């Protein structure tokens, strides 16, 4: 993981404050923006009006921070450069889980702060952040190997928990993708997890909410390799790297099935990757199960 400078410290604080101020606007903007627009993002997914609105807000606000030089979004094909920006690059999933807007379930924003041009490895992150729009709005930020949870109230952030770590005794799991599309190796692993009576299924259709369950209760989240998508479904720069950075900073592990997500070398801004996150023992078992099929 990248070493921070004193300039980075101030920039990260500014980014967190900006995300706190913007979160109420993103939440308020969901009302009346539940319909699809006639456009798709670079991954081929139909865009909701809420996706576009959140993306525009975040671009405007984050690029206004002097130390941020580049804005990259899951919703856009290319990077956006600030006219007089600094050396930090932000990679954003503006509204992770936006398909949950129709049933009014959890969603939020994922942000990776890199100190190098994108695409980049997760090892080049200086911060990983997610903003959870649940019954209350919270921010979970990993900075310099330490995870802090904030509660957002009227655009201000207040520390709720410091030195957040995954509980030693995991109790939840959540697996994405259609079950018939899982590989034989992952299916076997999933059946072992399901047979463990100490673990309960918690899957809500938004990575941000499902990983927050793991951060709160301990466990494992997976959006695995699929027969129809061997490269995985989640985006490395915008989702996998920041969330992997947070989970690892909280004492857990991340994996693409072979190695830490933070060590995956990207080829493109919108690369996809299998994602496995959680307590170390559960991820070790996953890697052993997946490797056994090779």
Where are these regions (language model features)?
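N-terminal, Lys/Arg-enriched amphipathic/low-complexity engagement segments
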Residues: 29, 35-36, 41-62
